[in-house]
Structures are given as C-alpha cells and as structure tokens.
Amino acid sequence: TLWDNRPTILKAEIDTRNWIEDKVGEVQWGDFNDFLSLREELIKEDASIEWDISKLRKEIFRKKISHITPSNLRDEIVDEAFNIFINKRHEIELFDGVEEALNFLSKKYVLGILTNGNANVYKFKIGKYFKFAISSLEARDSKPNRAHFDKALEFVDDISFDQMLHIGDHQVNDILGAYNLGIDTLWFNNNNEKWSQDFPKPDEFKSWDILPRIIENKYE
C-alpha cells in the first residue's frame, strides 16, 4: 500500500537466485505453480510456515539446494542467501505523497502497520510515523483472519474496532478482513481495479496526495 511491492520482490528474488547459482551452479527453480506446490508441501511439514514467510523463504532455498553437502555448508548458503534477499526486499520506492500524508496524519491519529509480509517499516524513514507494526510472524496468522486486528488493539487505549480505519490495497486481505470486524476501510486502488467482492465497495483513492483530505472530510 505504501510502495509497489511487486518489482521490489521480483528484483530481490532474481538477485538472490543469481547469487545462489554463482555459488552452487544452475538451480531448477520452477514456475509459480511449482512454488505453490512446494509451499503446500512445506506447510504440511511445518504449519508455522503458513505465516512465517521468512522461514518459508529459507526452506525453499534449502529444498532447491538439497544436493549440496555437507549440511552445514548448505545451511550457510541458505542463511546468506536469505540475508541478501531481505536486504534487497527493503530497497523500496515509496508512492508519491506517502511521506507527506503520513507526516500530516501522524500528528492527529495513531498510525500502525498490519502486514502479511516481512518488511520492517522501521528500517525506512517513514517508520517514525508509526506507533506499531504487526507482521504475520507476530500475529501468528495472516490477514484476512482477525489476529492482526486483535493485536492492534493492544497498542491503543480504549479504542474499539468501530473507531478504527484500515487502509489497504488488497480486496480480501485488507478490506474484507477489516469489514468482517466492523472496521471502517479505505481502498487504495491505484491500478483502477474493478471491485469483485460481494459486499459494498468502500471509498477508494488512487493517490496518497489526497488521502489527508479524504480522511478529514470523512471524520472531521
């Protein structure tokens, strides 16, 4: 929602794979369906992988270089590969207007991050605007399930779900998850997607430049 995650993840993945292949030779990575199948296989072996995506990433690397021996060498390569990936994963470019909007809103509201990912917002200059950040690892679950939202209540005093606003770009993980709990929502729709859910479409915006004005008009 704050930056375009897709090119960031893609570049991190490609750079990490190239580094691994420089170390061990060509690796059969497979396509996205192969990734999903391997993910399901790993979850059957360790249910926590469903919400611990850092562990998921490491275990995928480990599976892909399972032919490397001894095991301690394989583990070293996996750990170093993950460090490369996670560092690259934090090389982001914020959407226009994000920092200005957060600076304005943080002076009037308590702001928090709820993410299914493993980016650490406090590594970015915008981290100073957020009172809390909850990942899937900390929630031990993933949106649209309610664990993230329940945990958010621990960081705010005397606030209930009907006094919250959740802003997100994913129709299910962000909007449906909040809607089911009676949390107000705003949909960040910068790609002009069609609304495809069977519950009412929330207010939407496509530019962070106008978000403060939308919130002021909505609540003040």
Q: What are these model-predicted stretches?
A:
Residues 6-7, 99, 103, 110-220:
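Asp-based, Mg2+/Mn2+-dependent phosphohydrolase catalytic module
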Residues 1-96:
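N-terminal helical cap/lid subdomain that shapes the substrate entry/recognition surface
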Residues 24, 69, 108-109, 182:
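Glycine-centered loop/turn motif at secondary-structure junctions
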Residues 91, 108-111:
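A general structural signal for well-ordered secondary-structure junctions
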